[in-house]
Swiss-Prot record:
Keyword field contains Iron: yes
Reactions that this protein is recorded to catalyse: S-(5-deoxy-D-ribos-5-yl)-L-homocysteine = (S)-4,5-dihydroxypentane-2,3-dione + L-homocysteine
Name of the protein this chain belongs to: S-ribosylhomocysteine lyase
Class of this enzyme: lyase
Role summary: Involved in the synthesis of autoinducer 2 (AI-2) which is secreted by bacteria and is used to communicate both the cell density and the metabolic potential of the environment. The regulation of gene expression in response to changes in cell density is called quorum sensing. Catalyzes the transformation of S-ribosylhomocysteine (RHC) to homocysteine (HC) and 4,5-dihydroxy-2,3-pentadione (DPD).
Subunit organization: Homodimer.
GO BP: quorum sensing
Gene from which this protein is expressed: luxS
Length: 171
């Protein structure tokens, strides 16, 4: 099985909260697609609670679009990582990491302004696969935690696993 890009970086050296350009690629028509790793918690130290990350998924996607779309950027998708330590954000364009960090911070401030669960988008049996698995309180705790820190930048060259380590780890 091919080694995915996300597994070529050393998760033991990642900081959080932090933005990382996980991948860039060109479409056949010449557009740039950038995938960002938005790392909320330090891997293998703390995972976001499942109800909180699910609620955050519903809120974060819209709030990030409000703060980041425009000036050559259009978000395609924001999805939680299976490890529950962050989100992947795919977009058209190449905003710098600080612009993404600023939008992320503004989105977390928006999460704190949500008054109750009735204001969570698509929170119903028709639009959500596990609509009863939500917690606004947990999502707001996650947002408060992010806002209590400076959002840093993780650099691939500083996190790259050496070739010998990759060979050692291959199954």
């Amino acid at each position: 099985m091919p080694l995915l890009d996300s597994f070529t970086v050393d998760h033991t050296r990642m900081s959080a909260p932090a933005v990382r350009v996980a991948k860039t690629m060109k479409t056949p028509s010449g557009d740039t697609i950038t995938v960002f790793d938005l790392r909320f918690t330090v891997p293998n130290k703390k995972a976001m609670p499942e109800k909180g990350i699910h609620t955050l998924e519903h809120l974060f996607a819209g709030f990030m679009r409000n703060h980041l779309n425009g000036e050559g950027v259009e978000i395609i998708d924001i999805s939680p990582m299976g490890c529950r330590t962050g989100f992947y954000m795919s977009l058209i364009g190449q905003p710098d990491e600080q612009r993404v960090a600023n939008a992320w911070k503004a989105a977390m401030e928006d999460v704190l302004k949500v008054k109750d669960q009735n204001h969570i988008p698509e929170l119903n049996v028709y639009q959500c696969g596990t609509y009863e698995m939500h917690s606004l309180a947990e999502a707001q705790d996650i947002a408060r935690d992010i806002l209590s820190h400076t959002i840093g930048i993780n650099h691939n060259d500083e996190l790259a696993l050496p070739e010998d380590k990759l060979k050692e780890l291959q199954i």
